[in-house]
Amino acid sequence: MEHPSTNYTPEQQHEKLKHYVLIPKHLWSYIKYGTHVRYYTTQNVFRVGGFVLQNPYEAVIKNEVKMAIRLQNSFNTKAKGYVTWTVAYNDISKLYAKPDAIMLTIQENVEKALHALNQNVLTLASKIR
């Protein structure tokens, strides 16, 4: 069953993708259980996504086995409105994941180190002139 899409303006999409990281396709299968993802379909429809339940997941879609990601909207399977759904990798054009605190810390540290390195290069360049 196809879920009716909610149309989001480009501004709303941008806001919903804040703090999410675009994942290159060759790394999709490494996204872990529990990670929250958002995505664009191959028809360029923005989806707010859900939490990874299984990935990678071999799904039979229209009598064909496809690599897919299985998502859920909650971790409480007894919650009212709990649903799971499968999205084939081939039906996704862009996949974004919300990094955990460890990854955000690593990213922050890399950015600080890069900034310090750039400052050192500028200092050395000014001394050479």
From Swiss-Prot:
It comes from African swine fever virus (isolate Tick/Malawi/Lil 20-1/1983). The keyword Cytoplasm does not apply. One of its GO terms (cellular component) is virion component. Its main location: virion. This is Uncharacterized protein C129R. GO terms for molecular function: hydrolase activity. One of its GO terms (biological process) is symbiont-mediated suppression of host type I interferon-mediated signaling pathway. It is found in: Virion. Keywords: Host-virus interaction, Hydrolase, Inhibition of host innate immune response by virus, Inhibition of host interferon signaling pathway by virus, Interferon antiviral system evasion, Viral immunoevasion, Virion. Transmembrane segments: none annotated. Its EC number is 3.1.4.-. Belongs to the asfivirus C129R family. The keyword Magnesium does not apply. Plays a role in the inhibition of type I interferon signaling pathway. Mechanistically, specifically interacts with 2',3'-cGAMP and cleaves it via its phosphodiesterase activity. In turn, prevents 2',3'-cGAMP interaction with host ER-resident STING1 leading to inhibition of downstream signaling pathway and type I interferon production.
